[in-house]
Amino acid sequence: MHKYQTHWVEHSIVKILSSAGKKYIALMAGGMSAEREVSLVSSEGVSKALIELGYSVTFIDMGADITVRLQEIKPDIVFNCLHGTYGEDGCLPGLLNIMRIPYTHSGMLSSALAFNKIHSRSWFLTNNINMAESIVVNKSDNIKNDPMKRPYVIKPLTQGSSIGVEVIFAEDNFNFADYDFPYGDQVIIEQYIKGRELQVAVLNGKALGVLEIKLLKNRFYDYETKYTEGFADHLCPAPLPANLYEKLLIESEKIYKTMNCKGPARAEFILEEQTNKLYALELNTHPGMTPLSIVPEIAAYAGINFTNLIEEIIKTASFES
């Protein structure tokens, strides 16, 4: 029988599950970003899988005292289950590099590059990855009219899970002069591409498969659609011609490798409805591990169940010297 020991620390409870003979893992989740809840839901499944695999697990709700907590518990590995600011943007990997603690998911520079939409876009274009037309708008520009012909997409520079994303259609009663920049003083304004939403899971450098998202209720793949059952259908494998399916796998591996990622990632694409032209949207280096998340679903299609997926992620844990 496993026994939990509960220790009170600032901002969180750490629960320690003892298990002999396996490495000791700190499961980092929660945190202070807008994606806190998604991170916590992801951590539930990850925790169960780690325990099933026989690891000793400590759950840490990340706060400002994270360095002290890591020094106290001295884990062999940190499983980075954070989403958004501090976990996904390269901050935590940078800290763990300094502390020389192996961690899962991509390193500091890869994470920072993928998380910032301006920098990742430049990287994609440099590597001949096709993207929709876009511009950067600063709050200080005081733009009063539409910055681009409608329809267009407003994207915060450094948010995931479609938080803060808005699609402005021709018929919408929207005045850009009233936009309040809720997630920072810069946004990306991107041409809206009407087409098929395609997602590719990559694990340790290998693309596992392509999934298509069919929207059932909302106008685009927003936060509500991503995390609410019944708002979208997932078609896996995506019903595509073999040559296009293969192209998506190759493009995703190319993006992953040129950005020097490790562990899991998810590449997002749009296949334009009229021209069948493929557009890359982004690479997510911290894909969700919730019951509705895409990477576990594609992995299952590829013959990797959730527990084995977590084991494969653990195998890549390392720090950068």
Swiss-Prot record:
It holds the Pfam family Dala_Dala_lig_C. The keyword Nuclease does not apply. GO terms for biological process: cell wall organization; peptidoglycan biosynthetic process; regulation of cell shape. PANTHER family: D-ALANINE--D-ALANINE LIGASE (PTHR23132), D-ALANINE--D-ALANINE LIGASE B (PTHR23132:SF23). ATP binds at residues 147-199. Residues 121-315 form the ATP-grasp domain. Mg(2+) 1 binds at E268, E282. It catalyses: 2 D-alanine + ATP = D-alanyl-D-alanine + ADP + phosphate + H(+). One of its GO terms (cellular component) is cytoplasm. Mg(2+) 2 binds at E282, N284. Its cofactor is Mg(2+); Mn(2+). It comes from the Bacteria. Its main location: cytoplasm. It is found in: Cytoplasm. Binds 2 magnesium or manganese ions per subunit. The keyword Cell wall biogenesis/degradation applies. Keywords: ATP-binding, Cell shape, Cell wall biogenesis/degradation, Cytoplasm, Ligase, Magnesium, Manganese, Metal-binding, Nucleotide-binding, Peptidoglycan synthesis. Its EC number is 6.3.2.4. Cell wall formation. This is D-alanine--D-alanine ligase.
